[in-house]
């Protein structure tokens, strides 16, 4: 089953980043743009400066799970978002990451 909420193509990432609307905290930078759909679409980018491949994939899995578990809270946001992860994410626990990310996404509304 294809997940229609995920942004994967490079040109889609570039389009949203070039739109230049951002919101950030010490863990995440979120680029966002309005979309025509009635749901949130997201892409996750973790740079190579953050750990090795195992660590980067773990962070991406955690972010996907946070979004999946909290979709009822953030589902009304009809935006395309790109989540850029900063290195400070490695020092935080999952519960803290969840609170920070959900709070940031809610601010987009």
Swiss-Prot record:
SUPFAM superfamilies from the UniProt entry: Ribosomal protein S5 domain 2-like
GO CC annotation terms, alphabetical: ribonuclease P complex
EC number of this enzyme: 3.1.26.5
GO molecular function annotations of the record: 3'-tRNA processing endoribonuclease activity; ribonuclease P activity; tRNA binding
The reaction(s) this protein catalyses: Endonucleolytic cleavage of RNA, removing 5'-extranucleotides from tRNA precursor
Pfam families for the chain: Ribonuclease_P
One record GO biological process: tRNA 5'-leader removal
Keyword terms of this UniProt record: Endonuclease, Hydrolase, Nuclease, RNA-binding, tRNA processing
Entry superkingdom: Bacteria
Gene3D superfamilies: 3.30.230.10
InterPro entries the record matches: Ribosomal_Su5_D2-typ_SF (IPR020568), Ribsml_uS5_D2-typ_fold_subgr (IPR014721), RNase_P (IPR000100), RNase_P_CS (IPR020539)
Family note: Belongs to the RnpA family.
Primary role: RNaseP catalyzes the removal of the 5'-leader sequence from pre-tRNA to produce the mature 5'-terminus. It can also cleave other RNA substrates such as 4.5S RNA. The protein component plays an auxiliary but essential role in vivo by binding to the 5'-leader sequence and broadening the substrate specificity of the ribozyme.
Oligomeric and partner information: Consists of a catalytic RNA component (M1 or rnpB) and a protein subunit.
Name of the protein in question: Ribonuclease P protein component
Taxonomic path: Bacteria, Bacillati, Mycoplasmatota, Mollicutes, Mycoplasmataceae
